[in-house]
Amino acid sequence: MLLKKGDNNENVKLMQQKLGIEPAVTNFGPKTEAAVKEWQAKNGLTPDGIVGPSTWAKIMGESAAAPTPIVSAPIAPVGGLKLDKLKGHIPDAVIAMIPDTAAKFQINTPLRLAHFLAQCGHESGGFRVTQENLNYSAKGLAGIFKKYFPTEAAATPYARQPQKIANKVYANRMANGSEASGDGYKFRGRGYIQLTGRDNYTQFGKAIGEDIASNPDAVSSNYALLSAAWFWSKNGLNKLADGGAGDTVVTSITKRVNGGTIGLPDRIKHFKEYYHLLA
């Protein structure tokens, strides 16, 4: 959920009703923005006038981990696209987040959106997983993290201990502290494109006006898609996506997202599926 000045939908009206703004309309104008800022300041939130998942959840009296936005019909277009074409292929809750997220980070053409969703879908196991699974066996560690565990014997003390594994493999990089600091596990991969490392969490927080480094779980619970879009934009992936619909473009994007080409056939398959729907 992301609402800001200029938006016009039923979610805006519902929010206005909760805040006591009269008359409640569907337009998010200056009056609504001022009311949101005032409410945020009174409730210990960043008074930026933007209604993200945390603000929405507090206004609605819900758990911040499970915001339940209203999805108006028809779904808002992005770059001239009707996102309801994606129904049945992507969870409705994800589709509902696309308009504002895509507009914020210019993922607003058939190519860009299809490439973006293909990567998100693969990295998250079909939009089901929002945080990194580090429950590896010794054999798995020696295969995936060979730099840190050159042999199964070296990996055995860490096997099936996700916290120890993360603290080991993510220590002393990405602005994380030492293995003993616990930063590796605290800032492990979250979101649909696995935001990882203190530096990325801090930068993402600045981009949305929240202290995400102090509440990293918000990435998986509230900002799975938005964090992925921020990563996408930060790494210049719109420009790569503009290169076309060929497998070589998917490969180039995959290397930047994954650091390699793990799962490339699945990413290509999903890209073709989404592009066919959106083009």
Question: Which residue ranges define each predicted feature?
Answer:
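Peptidoglycan-targeting cell-wall enzymes and recognition modules
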Residues: 77-90, 121-231
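Acidic helix/loop microenvironments that form the catalytic cleft of cell-wall polysaccharide enzymes
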Residues: 30-43, 120-124, 241-263
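Secretory-pathway/luminal and periplasmic proteins that interact with or process carbohydrate-rich
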Residues: 44-47, 64-66, 122-132, 259-267
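N-terminal export signals and maturation junctions of secreted/periplasmic proteins
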Residues: 3, 62-100, 104
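Short acidic, glycine/serine/threonine-rich helix-capping segments at coil-helix boundaries
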Residues: 2-62
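Extracellular/periplasmic catalytic domains that process cell-envelope and extracellular macromolecules
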Residues: 108-112, 185-188, 223-224, 247-250
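Active-site-adjacent structural elements in enzyme catalytic domains
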Residues: 110-125
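An amphipathic alpha-helical core segment
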Residues: 208-262
